[in-house]
């Protein structure tokens, strides 16, 4: 079965959002640490969360864009974590998370993932 356009769109959106999350997290980290004269290093665990999410998104996007996908089904947890990106001021991540949930619940996308051979 040929990969639906929505699956391709999802994989590209996740890749772009992952790259943006890594850049956003790094920029936020640098701004807080330098803006507080290194006192912001205490906030490091919280500031690194967007970067960690970005790395997971990049890996998931690469696995989803491959043919055949190395993903058994779309990750609902990843979409929820993307929507939680609004806590760090990342509106793009919120939009991508909502689009991911809507597209992954589409009948065509569900049918495509169900038709994939189980490894």
Can you describe what each PLM-predicted range is?
Residues 1-24, 53-81, 96-119:
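Membrane-interface extramembranous regions at the lipid-water interface
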Residues 45-46, 80-91:
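Individual transmembrane alpha-helices with interfacial aromatic-anchor signatures
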Residues 49, 92-97:
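Short, aromatic-rich membrane-interface segments at the entry and exit
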Residues 2, 38, 87-91, 102:
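Flexible interhelical turns and helix-capping residues at alpha-helix boundaries
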Residues 23-53, 66:
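Membrane-helix interface segments in multi-pass membrane proteins
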Residues 28-30, 48, 60, 64, ...:
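Hydrophobic membrane-targeting signal helices
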